[in-house]
A protein has these predicted regions:
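Short alpha-helical
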Residues: 12, 36, 61-62, 81-82, ...
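Conserved acidic E/D residue at the C-terminus of a beta-strand in Rossmann-like folds
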Residues: 58, 124, 148
Length: 204
């Protein structure tokens, strides 16, 4: 439980995202990105909201394995296969899309892939412009949300932990004593394949 309590803050982002879009058990969710934000959102959607199907797209296979461990029903390396083809093959039409990869090109693709009346959540901070076709949004009556803060969601996440609805330990890949903080930072920056969350310990 000690590790879990240290991981409350990352899950507050997922709590803010899901609190805005109000997922249901009938949703088919597509998450771009299997980094910490994407993985916490997977756990929230499956563990808290019992969402019917969760699909995760990423270009790093090791991250996709982490997504499976966090509860994803489907994973796809969209650097190797067309996401549109994959969804068509599986007969899936996303009703909820979360962009946790935060690349400007994703929004237009998400608009194209979304089902009518779907919700799309943006989590990125890119200052680069993205090109979108307005008709794709209004024609499907899509709703677009943004999320950047935790919005006082700590009590919500603590409640999830107490009920056993999420498992933050699955996101912790490395632990370092604080004396080796430089090594921890270097690992986090250089090894995106195997490194997700790095914890520092302060025991002597």
């Amino acid at each position: 439980m000690l590790i879990s309590t240290r991981m409350v803050e990352p899950f507050t982002i997922a709590a803010n995202v899901t609190g805005q879009v109000n997922p249901t058990e009938n949703d088919i969710a597509l998450i771009y990105g299997a980094g910490p934000m994407g993985l916490t959102t997977v756990q929230a959607l499956k563990g808290v909201y019992n969402v019917k199907e969760v699909i995760v797209a990423d270009r790093i296979d090791e991250r996709l394995e982490m997504a499976k461990e966090s509860g994803a029903d489907w994973v796809i390396n969209n650097g190797q296969q067309s996401l549109q083809d994959f969804l068509d093959e599986k007969g899936l039409k996303p009703t909820l899309i979360v962009d946790a990869a935060c690349h400007p090109s994703i929004l237009q693709e998400a608009i194209s892939l979304a089902s009518p009346a779907a919700r799309i959540v943006l989590m990125g901070f890119s200052s680069d412009p993205c090109q979108i076709v307005q008709q794709g949004i209004t024609g499907k009556e899509l709703s677009i949300y943004s999320s950047r803060l935790n919005a006082n969601k700590f009590p919500v996440v603590i409640g999830w932990l107490e009920k056993g609805l999420i498992d933050p330990d699955k996101l912790v890949t490395h632990t370092f004593n604080y004396h080796h903080v430089t090594d921890a930072i270097e690992l986090f920056e250089k090894d995106q394949r195997h490194c997700c969350k790095v914890l520092l310990t302060f025991s002597e």
